[in-house]
Regions:
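Walker A/P-loop
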Residues: 14
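Short beta-strand-centered segment that lines the nucleotide-binding/catalytic pocket of NTP-utilizing
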Residues: 26-40
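ATP-dependent small-molecule kinase phosphotransfer cores
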Residues: 36-109
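ATP-dependent NMP and nucleoside kinases share a basic, alpha-helical "lid"
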Residues: 98-106, 112-145
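Small-molecule kinase domains that catalyze NTP-dependent phosphoryl transfer to phosphate-bearing small molecules
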Residues: 99, 106, 127-128, 148, ...
């Protein structure tokens, strides 16, 4: 079984991933794959062709080796749907290809494989998984966690949450919800309940 795990900023999906790993389940992190893919020479060339040299890291100009600044790229495409669509068309095919390769490899040894995907529903990846699981937290909890963790202003956090798909919308699309409005012990119980229900 391949399970897609998603959530929003500050809902605790990475914490759930860590706890699942501690229990011995393999978890593929699509964010890690995307960091690897963005370093592929052909991807760098395609991104520069579309978004210009301003998305490159400055410190690599001496060595002549090009690399993309994720921060600069984010600022370039943020709030521009056309640019986001172009970025996705460049990044998603190699990311999905690598994800499938890792799933295939892990399925040889493991009955269940989890894949952590922040934008699972936004980029319509549901068909890649046997089931989808949402790590859910209410908006107040999301804001509190991100303020504590990232040192951003509340306005910035609100803006990020508003830019993401509504959590209640994600609830409707998910096969299972892991509630995470409480502490670590409560989350452990939620994960245990989920594992028991699935019999994995």
């Amino acid at each position: 079984m391949v399970i897609g795990l998603t959530g929003g900023i500050g809902t605790g999906k990475s914490t759930v991933s860590r706890k699942l790993r501690e229990k011995g389940y393999p978890v593929i992190d699509l964010d890690i794959i995307s960091r690897e893919v963005i370093a592929y020479p052909e991807v760098i060339d395609e991104l520069v062709r579309n978004f210009g040299n301003e998305i490159l890291e400055e410190q690599n100009e001496i060595s002549g080796k090009k690399s993309i600044s994720r921060n600069k790229l984010r600022q370039t495409v943020f709030k521009d749907e056309k640019k986001v669509a172009v970025l996705n068309s460049i990044m998603h095919p190699p990311i999905i290809e690598e994800m499938r390769r890792q799933i295939k490899e892990l399925r040889q040894k493991h009955k269940t494989v989890f894949v952590e995907v922040q934008l699972l529903f936004e980029v319509k990846l549901e068909k890649e998984f046997d089931m989808t699981v949402l790590v859910y937290a209410n908006r107040k909890t999301q804001i509190e966690r991100v303020l504590k963790r990232d040192g951003r202003s509340e306005g910035e956090v609100q803006e990020i949450i508003n830019a993401q798909m509504n959590m209640d919308e994600k609830r409707k699309l998910s096969n299972y919800i892991i509630e995470n409005n409480g502490n670590s012990e409560m989350l452990d119980l939620e994960i245990e309940k989920f594992i028991k229900k699935l019999g994995i």
